[in-house]
Each structure stands twice: as C-alpha cells, then as structure tokens.
Swiss-Prot record:
Pfam families found in the cross-reference section: Dala_Dala_lig_C (PF07478), Dala_Dala_lig_N (PF01820)
Binding annotation for Mg(2+) 2: E328, N330
Segments forming domain ATP-grasp: 154-361
Name this polypeptide is given: D-alanine--D-alanine ligase
InterPro entries xref list: ATP-grasp, ATP_grasp_subdomain_1, D-Ala_lig_Van_CS, D_ala_D_ala, Dala_Dala_lig_C, Dala_Dala_lig_N, PreATP-grasp_dom_sf
Cofactor: Mg(2+); Mn(2+)
GO molecular function, one term: ATP binding
Alphabetical UniProt keywords: ATP-binding, Cell shape, Cell wall biogenesis/degradation, Cytoplasm, Ligase, Magnesium, Manganese, Metal-binding, Nucleotide-binding, Peptidoglycan synthesis
GO cellular component assignments: cytosol
Biological processes per GO annotation: cell wall organization; peptidoglycan biosynthetic process; regulation of cell shape
Length: 371
C-alpha cells in the first residue's frame, strides 16, 4: 500500500468508456503535471475503454497526443483495482490482481474525475463516489447528468429565463425532422449526440438531403440526437469556479475563431480543429466591450446555478446581434494544454496550480451527501 503522509491524497481518474477517452487522458496529463506536489500526494487511476480500473504510474508524457497518436489506457497500463462503494472503506483502492487480490493499494482523500462524456461526466462516477463516501472535484450527480444531456440543459436554462437556441430532439425510433421543424430551424443545422462532447459525432448540415447521414453519424455515439439551428455569432466562453467558502466567480471571456480548415470553408470547430491541427485561433481575453463581457459573466453564473452545478464549469455562448445565447454547459471542461478553461483563469490572474488547488479544496470542504 502507498503510505499516507500529511499531504491531501488526490486520485486523478481518467480515460473511461466514452468516445472522449483520449481527450480525458490528455486532460489528466496536464492536471498531473500541474497539481502542487507540496500540497497534494497524487495517485493516477486510469479506466480502460471497456471500463476496467488500473493504478498507473501517472507519467504525464504518456498521456499526450504524439504525432497524431491518441493516448489510451489499457489493462497493461497498471494494476487492476476497484473502489468499493462502502463509505466505511474510507476511499480505499483495492487490488484485483490475482497475486494480491483484496490488498489495499492506496487510500485517497478526494477524487478528481477528469472524465469527459458518458460513464464519467454524466453523474455515473459521481454516484459511485457518493456511495463510497469519497469527496470529488466538480458537479454532483444531478448537475453532471443535466449538463451532459443537451436537451435537459436547455430545459433548465429556459426555465431560468436564459436565452438558448432553437432545437429539435430526436429520440430512438425517430429519424427525421418534420417540414414545420425544418422551416423553423432553417439551415444550416448542427446534428449532435445529445450526450456527448469534444464535437465527436457532430455534423454541420447545409442541405436537408445530408440530414439522414448526419443523424446516423450522431447515433454511433448516442441513440438520442439533437438538431440545433445554426446561430450566426461569435463563439465566446466563460469559466465558472466555486471556492471552498461557497463564493462563485466567473473568468475573463475567451473567444474561438475558426476559419476554413483543411480546405473547408464551414468554420466548424470540430474534433480535429480542437485537438489535432491549428485551424482555430483562441483569443483570451476576447475582444468585446466591457459591458458585454460583464453580461456574459453574469449569464455564466446564472447558467451554473440553473443546473445546480458545483465546483466548476465552462459555459459556451454565441454572441449575436441580439445579444448572448447560451449554447452549452461543460461540467468537466477540457484541461489540455490548449483548453480554454485554464487559459481564461490564467488571464484572470489565477495560475494553473492555484486553480487546481481551489477545485480540490472546494471538493474537500463540500464533502459528500445531500447539500
């Protein structure tokens, strides 16, 4: 067993079963590199694409995109383990290795679930950690589930009086958009898995003849699909951070500018543009008027509270001629070296190690259970 010391022991959990597995690994590598070793004793736990948990060495260099190759957790990455859903075990990570089955490999104080997408960012691991009685960074079960599902995010935002874009939800068994809906949405539309991120499975449709293929592509990742009206406007983002005393703050605003990439002219911020090439320009701070920035920060905090979020979130907006429109809420935003969330906080005067420490401290202060 890894011996205890006076530092807070943090289990950074990454990988997972979703199609965002690789991005989770890259985010974890960045976090492992920036957690303050004087304050935190870090344990790295990878989850394979089929859901097995392994204790890894946590070397950040193994969790990077190298020459276009995406990182992945495998059974060979470390020792198989489990986290018992028993609060009496006090965060024990138990070996599943035949040679040492049941041995306690480590006992952790808090979990940092750097998981993107289903089976991680959607309330599932948060539920496990609640059962296990282990504090964790980020949103609770309800907010994680609501933030992951674009349909229910929009429902909660609308109920709070926040502006959202027009959309149609296609549940399993429905494979088209009616003529009335097409007239209402207009073109282009964006077809997305309802519970996904990193633009995986997302298509831009500029002709209704392209819709069936776009729905099929989205359904490779989620049986529920959302068709969103294209919104003409600037893409802005704002980070939200909760502190241990319950105070909630919003970051400097960032902007994503995408021209035609790889010979395309659609300016679509897709997976490759985000992570594999230089097709996007990220402006932090965004070049917007002070009153616009202030309004977006206020809306970001309102959106954070509308889904009962905790810990942190990144709120994405379109800035249109009629004002800001809330696009999405990410309850566990990316933490790669190019991710907007840490960059926006750095521009706000909060460096990366301080940002991560605030998240861990907030998780410990919050604890588990009803709150």
């Amino acid at each position: 067993m890894i011996a205890r010391n006076q530092r807070t022991r943090v289990a950074v959990v990454y990988g997972g079963r979703s199609s965002e597995h690789a991005i989770s690994c890259v985010s974890a590598g960045s976090i492992l590199r920036n957690l303050d070793p004087e304050r935190f004793d870090v344990v790295a736990v990878g989850i394979t694409p089929d859901g097995s948990w392994v204790l890894t060495d946590g070397r950040p260099e193994t969790l990077a995109i190298t020459d276009g190759r995406l990182p992945e957790v495998s059974a060979e990455s470390g020792t198989a383990l489990a986290l018992p859903a028993d609060p009496g075990r006090r965060g024990e990570l138990v070996s599943l290795s035949p040679a040492a089955a049941g041995e306690v490999l480590a006992a952790v104080d808090v979990v940092f679930p750097v998981l993107h997408g289903p089976y991680g960012e959607d309330g599932t691991i948060q539920g496990l950690l609640e059962l296990a009685g282990v504090p964790y960074v980020g949103a609770g079960v309800l907010a994680s589930a609501a933030g992951m599902d674009k349909e229910f995010t929009k429902k909660l935002l609308v109920a709070e009086g926040l502006p959202v874009g027009d959309h149609v939800v296609l549940r399993p068994g429905r494979a088209n958009v009616t003529l009335d809906e097409r007239e209402r949405l207009g073109l282009p539309v964006f077809v997305k898995p309802a519970r996904g991120g990193s633009s995986i499975g997302v298509s831009r449709v500029s002709d209704w003849a392209e819709l069936p293929a776009a729905i099929e592509a989205a359904r490779r990742h989620d049986p529920k699909v959302i068709v969103e009206a294209g919104i003409a406007g600037r893409e802005l983002e704002c980070g939200v951070l909760e502190y241990p005393d319950g105070r909630v703050d919003a970051s400097t605003i960032g902007e994503i500018r995408v021209a035609g990439v790889r010979g395309r002219e659609d300016g679509f911020y897709d997976f490759a543009t985000k992570y594999l090439d230089d097709g996007a320009e990220l402006d932090v701070p965004a070049k917007v008027e002070d009153d616009v920035a202030d309004e977006i920060r206020r809306l970001a905090i309102r959106a954070f509270r509308a889904i009962d979020c905790q810990g942190l979130a990144r709120v994405d907006f379109f800035l249109t001629d009629d004002g800001p429109v809330v696009n999405e809420i990410n309850t566990m935003p990316g933490f790669t070296t190019i991710s907007m969330y840490p960059r926006m906080w750095a521009a706000s005067g909060v460096d990366y190690p301080t940002l991560l420490a605030a998240m861990v401290d907030t998780a410990v202060a919050r604890g588990t259970g009803l709150r």
